Curated annotation (Swiss-Prot):
Reported function: Catalyzes the transamination of ornithine into L-glutamate gamma-semialdehyde, the second step of arginine degradation.
Family matches, as PANTHER family: AMINOTRANSFERASE CLASS III (PTHR11986), ORNITHINE AMINOTRANSFERASE, MITOCHONDRIAL (PTHR11986:SF18)
Chief subcellular location: cytoplasm
Protein name (Swiss-Prot/TrEMBL): Ornithine aminotransferase
GO cellular-component term (any): cytosol
Keyword Transferase assigned: yes
Summary of activators and inhibitors of this protein: By arginine and urea.
Single GO MF annotation: pyridoxal phosphate binding
Broadest EC class assigned to this enzyme: transferase
Sequence positions bearing N6-(pyridoxal phosphate)lysine: 272
Cross-link Glycyl lysine isopeptide (Lys-Gly) (interchain with G-Cter in ubiquitin): residue positions: 390
Matches recorded under Pfam families: Aminotran_3
Subcellular location: Cytoplasm
Length: 424
């Protein structure tokens, strides 16, 4: 057997031996994938209900995206931003018009987009709001996940997984301030900080429209309108992290659109499905006024805006538009959540909660009703029966299939979950 076709057993053995152990994957090996289907090296078929954390909204190896990738790869892959390239210019025009913003800054990973936004917010605070130098504050909310870099983990309240032995953290970047906690979904928690003497130094608030890693936590419908109003009142930027929730996943192009706030965010972050899972592509969207705080040399990336990524991202967004995947996610998501709630009612309390929006959903498992079995145990059973999902926070299973999944496969997924719950 060649290295290109390792067995599942050999793959796991080599990864355990040669790779850092910074992940704890389910014991399944991806060999090839198409749409919502995945095959392991031995040919077993699985349904993908994770979508690489919503990076493959368009489905694995979408032909339109792969065609764009292969054609561009034979023409030009990298210029760096030391020179212009004609594909990035097309992407910049396309993505800003697609999402209704004035300007874009391209990066690669979602975490890079977050760091870019934090830097941009600080610069804006000093250059536009006249915050005293080195006093700018950026606030988040408890339970957030914005990535693994220092700025992102400084915002985190998940100490054991995100912060243990990584300190000290970035000053004035936190999801709380002094004695004030900031609970997600509680806009009033920002008020004591914004109205304190230090409130004038708050440059930005960064939030997820739905908290993903926290277990698909959907805020009250009036949360973002209230936060947006507070930001306008106190001259604070609102940064919305749509890296996991955006690009059709919840049934709207941006999840923030569900909340009908009077003002759109000042800064929006995109990643993951921006390339359909083909390449690392991310970006920061904002206004000319805010983005003008970056000047040549103040921020950048060798690979950000490269022609290969730019061409792929255009194709990925074309798929969302042309295949009406926002509408599809809304329609299928409504049916999926209804089926999960029906399953909850028959689960004898094993499923304690169903939550989500569109095709970004989760079920909460109560181990006390499941013979002490956990969400991990249920995911292992589901894997054995051909359905792939991953727990988060021990007792929650995120369910987020590609938006192109068929109704039949979605139904099969629900039936598989039901069967595996009976086997717990």
């Amino acid at each position: 057997m060649s290295e290109a076709t390792l067995s599942s057993k050999q793959t796991i053995e080599w990864e355990n031996k040669y790779s850092a152990h910074n992940y704890h994957p389910l014991p399944v090996v991806f060999h090839k994938a198409k749409g919502a289907h995945v095959w392991d090296p031995e040919g077993k078929l699985y349904l993908d209900f994770l979508s690489a954390y919503s990076a493959v909204n368009q489905g694995h190896c979408h032909p339109h995206i792969i065609k764009a990738l292969t054609e561009q790869a034979q023409t030009l892959t990298l210029s760096s931003r030391a020179f212009h390239n004609d594909v990035y210019a097309q992407f910049a025009k396309f993505v800003t018009e697609f999402f209704g913003f004035e300007t874009v800054l391209p990066m690669n990973t979602g975490a890079e987009a977050v760091e870019t936004a934090l830097k941009l917010a600080r610069r804006w605070g000093y250059m536009k709001k006249n915050i005293p130098q080195d006093k700018a504050i950026i606030l988040g909310a408890e339970g957030n996940f914005h990535g693994r870099t220092f700025g992102a983990i400084s915002l985190s309240t998940d100490y054991e997984d995100s912060k243990l032995h990584f300190g000290p953290f970035v000053p004035n970047v936190a999801s709380g301030h002094s004695v004030h906690k900031i609970r997600y979904g509680h806009a009033e928690d920002f008020v004591p900080i914004l109205e304190s003497p230090e409130g004038k130094n708050v440059a930005a608030i960064i939030l997820e429209p739905i908290q993903g890693e926290a277990g698909i936590v959907v805020p009250p419908a009036d949360y973002f309108p209230k936060v947006s109003a507070l930001c306008r009142k106190h001259n604070v930027l609102l940064i919305v992290d749509e890296i996991q929730t955006g690009i059709g996943r919840t049934g709207e192009l941006l999840c923030y659109d569900h909340y009908k706030a009077e003002a759109k965010p000042d800064i929006v972050l995109l990643g993951k499905a921006l390339s359909g899972g083909v390449l690392p592509v991310s970006c920061v969207l904002s206004s000319h006024d805010i983005m003008s705080c970056f000047t040549p040399g103040s921020h950048g990336s060798t690979f950000g805006g490269n022609p290969l990524a730019s061409r792929v991202a255009i194709a990925a967004l074309e798929v969302i538009r042309d295949e009406k995947l926002c509408q599809r996610a809304a329609q299928l998501g409504s049916s999926f959540i209804a089926q999960l709630k029906a399953l909850q009612a028959k689960s004898n309390g094993i499923i304690s909660e169903v939550r989500g929006m569109g095709l970004l959903t989760a079920i909460v498992i109560d181990p006390s009703k499941a013979n002490g079995k956990t969400a991990w145990d249920l995911c292992l059973l589901m894997k054995d029966h051909g359905l792939l999902a991953k727990p988060t926070h021990d007792h929650i299973i995120r369910l987020a299939p590609p938006l192109v999944i068929s109704e039949e496969d979605l139904q099969t997924g629900v039936e598989t979950i039901a069967k595996c719950i009976d086997l717990l």
